[in-house]
Amino acid sequence: IKEEIKMTIIVTGGAGFIGSNFVFHMLNKYPDYRIVCLDCLTYAGNLSTLEPVMDNPNFRFVKESITDRDAVYKLFEEEHPDMVVNFAAESHVDRSIENPQVFLDTNIIGTSVLMDACRKYGIKRYHQVSTDEVYGDLPLDRPDLFFHEDTPIHTSSPYSSSKAAADLLVLAYHRTYGLPVTISRCSNNYGPY
């Protein structure tokens, strides 16, 4: 007998490196949660990474972009999510210098689409996965310096600017509409996947 689902989480960018590890963690730790992965499978996403969970009855993969408002709203209507965790992003500094528009579209407009859907469908929590790149650079000759939550935003590329803009938009939705949000700004990640 299938256990009753206690929570449904839409994980955007879940076929990427960090997102897929989050998917694995959540399905292992919370077997009574439903995880819906929304990913358009750009250069950063790899569907084969999710192969170990494809047969899990509490997992669903949807190949769509967070910039596609109709697809996002349709998914929210089908799944009735409790929470959204947004890993989806264009995320390479050098690529952002070559083609900034795609970074603006995905990282800002895509976040806007998600925020509107969260507001419309009354989600309980939205988590924005951001980057420490929004803080700028630390001097190499000062290993004693660190970024912290109060460090001012000081972007240095189209990538970091697009992520900072998305973060500010998320905070604006919290303040304006009372949407429950959190933001994490992690540094580079590495590991086996």
Q: What residue ranges belong to the model's regions?
A:
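N-terminal Rossmann-like NAD(P)+-binding domain of SDR-like oxidoreductases, especially those catalyzing
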Residues: 2-192
